[in-house]
Amino acid sequence: MYSEALLSRFYEPVRAGDLSGSTSSGKQGNPTCGDVVEIAIRMNDGIIQQARFRTLGCAIAIAASDLICELAEGMTVTGVHVIDAAKISEALGGITAERWQCIAAPLAALQDALSK
């Protein structure tokens, strides 16, 4: 059973959609279950001003994408390293280790966007 925190982000993600004027975007797939995540960011002076996502995947992947975008906003490129699977899992009410790949895809998409 999913937590209320996860279901809330799954049913009503705040940061889903396109980001006009994005400065970079990254994409990552999850070969285990087929999730595909794209995260677009807008940077200004080394700070992530906005982040938006488009995810085709499970409830965990969508909720994690939304939370990762929220946490990334206001952070520096080097500061986002504090966002990890354990932190996301805890914030979403505890995700079993078998499903952490659903968190890894949006994290990798963010890193891909930051590497460009």
List the model feature ranges, each with a label.
Residues 1-116:
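Domain-level signature for proteins that mediate thiol-based redox and metal-cofactor handling
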